[in-house]
Amino acid sequence: MNKEKLVLAYSGGLDTSVLVHWLAQQGYEVIALCLDLGQKVEDLDAILEKGKKAGAAKVLIENVEEEFVQDYVLPSIQWNALYEGTYLLGTSLARPLISKKQIEVAGREGAVAVAHGATGKGNDQVRFELSYYALNPNIRVVAPWKIPEFYKKYPGRTELLAYAEKYGIPVKASKEQPWSSDENLMHISFESGMLEDPWQAPLPEMFELSQSPKEAPVESQEILIEFLKGNPVAVDGKKFSPAKLLTYLNELGGQHGIGRIDMVESRFVGMKN
């Protein structure tokens, strides 16, 4: 009997690495789809191997940096889109694109279902599922964090770490570093674990893309950004593609300690994060 195919939005992190294995145990032929959205911290080759070790029938990695910046990031910058006046929406912008690519892969591979690793408490479940159904109203959505057999047995990161250890799934997270991260060209964000305590400041080593303003150059650096029809196209006379331009500006800003935000977010479901 052929197994039903399922396309999982795969980041290579703790949650989705465990989900690859768990979904395979439920009888699905898991196709793990990881999109390259410009994440510098993650090793995509390592993610490929990790997905295979976790039990994926296929691990697909697709570079969508240019599409992400051109069609999602730049419009949000033009709109000066900030959630609650602070959050730059880096994660929010990426989810519809990830969903779109999952639906496309499901069509090519003959998959009957798509899956995500979002919990029933956060915003991502809404972003993913509304996007899935908008693109394919007939697709089956598997959300393990809403399935009692999963979330009652593995309610948090401690249990997921134990699961990964039991089945030999290599993950970056640990009991000493229990937080989760999400990175793309728009941002890198950290949440969960110790960060759920609003009195707990982020640790210095968490900031992987920017140095502390205390250690940034004293002298300012002036740059000239050229725009064409509302979109940035060049810096100091040098032309870049949208993704390359944002990559360059991210590196420059990081050197000068620009871009750090610490906030408490109001979630769609009414909780704080």
Feature-to-residue mapping (PLM):
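Nucleotide-activated chemistry modules centered on ATP-dependent adenylation/adenylyltransferase
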Residues: 1-9, 14-273
